[in-house]
Amino acid sequence: MARYLGPKAKLSRREGTDLFLKSARRSIADKAKFDSKPGQHGRTSGARTSDFGLQLREKQKVKRMYGVLEKQFRRYFEAADRRKGNTGANLLSLLESRLDNVVYRMGFGSTRAEARQLVSHKAITVNGQSVNIASYLVKPGDVVAVREKSKKQARIVEALQLAQQVGIPAWVEVNADKVEGTFKKAPDRDEFGADINESLIVELYSR
């Protein structure tokens, strides 16, 4: 399946929650009414969604949130299932360790999509080496930085200023002057308040 390129607010309305696809410069709630699905008849209540439908919708929501397509998402689940511990928590840990997500969490990109673009345009280094693969898994202790020639880009400066106002997660440490940060660890499940029910995804793939 090709990556969705349409209006981001429409995806958040479809899932009924903020997928953080839009910059926090303007709350997506200003543009998207989460209690209304996209389309002319969005408010019309339909039949009760089946368990399978709920599971499928949750998977779609998380895929869209992290910008991951089905084949790769399935591989993340299989890797999470092989690890010790809770499969759902392992899945989220892998997603949070993606380089594009870490760049976003550090505040170098205002959205994951913008962070992914920075990675693909070779504006990001890991431990001093250029990495242009968005799915690259960052390890605890890795130093992620914006390359010198990209540090003055207005979008990066603005994103970092905004991130400092909103708050940078505890599992990354950022040096705003150097425009670099350290990935301290993958976050524990209770450290980020994303509206995700990962158990539904586990149930779906365990059918």
From Swiss-Prot:
Keywords: Ribonucleoprotein, Ribosomal protein, RNA-binding, rRNA-binding. GO terms for biological process: ribosomal small subunit biogenesis; translation. Residues 97-157 form the S4 RNA-binding domain. Residues 31-53 are annotated as: Disordered. One of its GO terms (molecular function) is structural constituent of ribosome. InterPro entries: Ribosomal_uS4, Ribosomal_uS4_bac-type, Ribosomal_uS4_CS, Ribosomal_uS4_N, S4_RNA-bd, S4_RNA-bd_sf. GO terms for cellular component: small ribosomal subunit. The keyword Cell wall biogenesis/degradation does not apply. Pfam families: Ribosomal_S4 (PF00163), S4 (PF01479). The keyword Glycosyltransferase does not apply. One of the primary rRNA binding proteins, it binds directly to 16S rRNA where it nucleates assembly of the body of the 30S subunit. Belongs to the universal ribosomal protein uS4 family. Part of the 30S ribosomal subunit. Contacts protein S5. The interaction surface between S4 and S5 is involved in control of translational fidelity. This is Small ribosomal subunit protein uS4. It comes from Paracidovorax citrulli (strain AAC00-1) (Acidovorax citrulli). The lineage of its organism: Bacteria, Pseudomonadati, Pseudomonadota, Betaproteobacteria, Burkholderiales.
